């Protein structure tokens, strides 16, 4: 019984990690905000994108 529980817990942990890494590239006019916890997007300099529109998306570590 403990073995099944351990396998289930480990599987759920891996699934949570996988879901956390599935993120969206920042839209055009937005860049990754490295100072933000969770790596959100922010308007790039000279862009007319609003901060609200950029904050709707997040970026993964590979795109920052």
From Swiss-Prot:
Keywords: Disulfide bond, Neurotoxin, Secreted, Signal, Toxin
Tissue localization of expression: Expressed by the venom gland.
GO terms under cellular component: extracellular region
Hydrolase as UniProt keyword: no
Intrachain disulfide bonds: none
Keyword Zinc: no
Record note on modification: Contains 3 disulfide bonds.
Location(s), subcellular: Secreted
Signal sequence, start to end: 1-18
UniProt-recorded Gene Ontology molecular function terms: toxin activity
Name of the protein this chain belongs to: Putative neurotoxin 4
């Amino acid at each position: 019984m403990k073995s099944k529980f351990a396998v289930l817990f480990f599987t759920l942990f891996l699934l949570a990690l996988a879901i956390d890494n599935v993120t969206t590239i920042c839209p055009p006019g937005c860049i990754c905000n490295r100072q933000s916890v969770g790596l959100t997007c922010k308007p790039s300099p000279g862009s007319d994108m609003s901060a609200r529109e950029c904050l709707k998306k997040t970026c993964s570590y590979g795109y920052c």
